[in-house]
Amino acid sequence: MRVLHVCSELYPILKTGGLADVTAALPPALASFGVDSRVLVPGFPAFMNAIKDKQLLINIPSRFGAEEINIFLAKIPNTKIDIYVVDAPSLFARPGNPYADSSNQAYADNYLRFALLGWVAARISEGLDAKWKPEVVHSHDWHAGLVPAYIKASELASGKKAVKTVFTVHNLAYQGLFPMSVFAELDLPGIFLSMNGLEFYGQVSFMKAGLYFADKITTVSPTYAKEIQSYEQGCGLEGLLADRHNDLYGVLNGVDPQVWNPKKDTLIEANYSVTTANVGKAKCKTALQAMTGLAKKEDAVVFGIVTRLTEQKGLNLLIEAIGEITSRGGQVVLLGSGDKALEEAFLAAAKKSPKSIAVQIGYDEEQAHRIIAGSDVILVPSRFEPCGLTQLYGLTYGTLPLVHKVGGLADTVTDSSLENLADGTATGFVFDEFSVESLTLAIRRAFALYNRKADWKKVRKTAMQQKVDWNAAADKIHQIYSQLV
């Protein structure tokens, strides 16, 4: 089976969030099920620089405001997977963030940039590459939301059955919304600008295009698949998603064991397994404390946070509850960037308590590994969370997740309640209500369990034994493909 994945990010070449981890890990995981995957990405500088030995597949005349368009074919570095790169310098050759300028303002022509990506995917689905034609095109998030629309438009124009399409929602909150006036520049049939198409409350929605026109829809956890059919988390699309519930699947993301594996992670102070976690994690904690300037205290409970600093991630709760950690002798290590007010609030907390709170603004993949290995608890107090990868990394590294019971967090972490401790299923700490009080109680329970060393080690062992690799997810995705082909 031949499948084309369409996305805007791919780890380790370009990453702004978990999307990149998923698009990198899924194609090789699908290979074990006989799926021949290829990937299509925009020609952002990161891709153009990292991908070598590119072969020119075709030159396309000016389109979507791009003066020059070249489609290259190459291998993803250090893999056997083929990748198509859409090189359109006037649209993609911009420094920094792939979606926004240096002031963090979204590029005004993002609709053209990602329309081109979707349009090229449709051309590949029709045989643009004479040597390889996909049977399924799988697009990821709003950046690739127009892919099913362009493929459906081609089917309507030609009268020929098009390839099948799958669209994955990684985060429904980011919808790719643009003024209605841009539709005229998208080269789509006029009938697509309607309630049964791209129109969304007087705007054009790339996310809605994917949800409406794809043959199958997946999202990244079973709980999130249910939540997005409700008013609270449907972001205005709950009606469409409820109508399409028979085509909607929640498939939990996995962890790539080649990247996240405490037994062989070269980025951490000491490697360890389930049986050697006590010694290994102690070494990683000491190294983390030294690196971040925290007080060297073996018995301090270290809470790690690796996240975007946004209200969605529950950081407004954490800034209010952080005193609960430090007053009990705990320490906090935070890595992330985002909302300026939150950045300043955490920096101020670190300045006030430099031996208890360490904050690094920005994203550093190596430091993320060190924080997750060296912490005792990984905090993920998100208001909503489609899947979440950080808690899965925490489980893998024996760093107990403390999470809000929502989305994929609810599906992957089992609370250390008395009954769960008794039957050996506990893997972390879960709080139900999105409030400072509920988060604070969960923090107190983490301290209480840490003081019962035997129980802590038991929960850590259970956490590290959880199956969180990509095999189960790839199996389910392959089953969805098989329904279509």
Curated annotation (Swiss-Prot):
Question: What Enzyme Commission number(s) apply to this enzyme?
Answer: 2.4.1.21
- Entry annotated with the keyword Transferase: yes
- Kindly state which keywords UniProt assigns to this record, in alphabetical order: Glycogen biosynthesis, Glycosyltransferase, Transferase
- Cite the GO molecular-function annotations of the record: alpha-1,4-glucan glucosyltransferase (ADP-glucose donor) activity; alpha-1,4-glucan glucosyltransferase (UDP-glucose donor) activity
Q: Does the keyword Glycosyltransferase apply?
A: yes
Q: Which GO terms describe its biological process?
A: glycogen biosynthetic process
Family affiliation: Belongs to the glycosyltransferase 1 family. Bacterial/plant glycogen synthase subfamily.
Pull one GO CC term from this UniProt entry.
Answer: cytosol
Q: In which pathway does it act?
A: Glycan biosynthesis; glycogen biosynthesis
Species in which this protein is naturally found: Francisella philomiragia subsp. philomiragia (strain ATCC 25017 / CCUG 19701 / FSC 153 / O#319-036)
Which PANTHER family is this protein grouped with? Answer: ALPHA AMYLASE DOMAIN-CONTAINING PROTEIN, GRANULE-BOUND STARCH SYNTHASE 1, CHLOROPLASTIC/AMYLOPLASTIC
What is this protein identified as? Glycogen synthase
